[in-house]
């Protein structure tokens, strides 16, 4: 009887273990099937969610690149306008006559800003070859555009050591209070800068220059 009880007890334990094992298998099988069924749904949803997200990211990156390119372009334009030696002239209310092609016409004067660097004598010769002279400042009112000049340019003003005066190419004497002469270097020639200032410079130093032609 004890053997039978032991056998029944062992059988009950085995059945219990088998039942538990079957339950575990069933759970695992259910879990596996559920995951297999869930994965396509998740992947499908992921694909559905990823596609707009990827598209948005692509647009954001493209806009970022476009912004960087635009900033670079505008920076280059700004720097070029900041350091460019040529001057943009407001022509409102101005009067003018015929000028050489591509020259600036302002109040019966023609101006050309040359970016090539020459010494004073070479600059003078270049202007003369175009039937013009180096810049002559004679009126703050008629030549108010010269306030916009940002860089240093040769003008037709030269120092006469014998009498200490400053004369223009045509021999006329510099009018008082027309230009503020500033000694930048030892020399007998003058550069024009902004706000009606003249800077003394060695005549052999290469600089850009302004040619001027009167139309009347």
From Swiss-Prot:
It comes from the Eukaryota. This is NKG2-D type II integral membrane protein. It is found in: Cell membrane. One of its GO terms (molecular function) is carbohydrate binding. Is not capable of signal transduction by itself, but operates through the adapter protein HCST. PROSITE patterns: C_TYPE_LECTIN_2. Disulfide bonds join 96-105, 99-110, 127-211, 189-203. GO terms for cellular component: cell surface; external side of plasma membrane. It comes from Pongo pygmaeus (Bornean orangutan). InterPro entries: C-type_lectin-like, C-type_lectin-like/link_sf, CTDL_fold, NKG2D, NKR-like_CTLD.
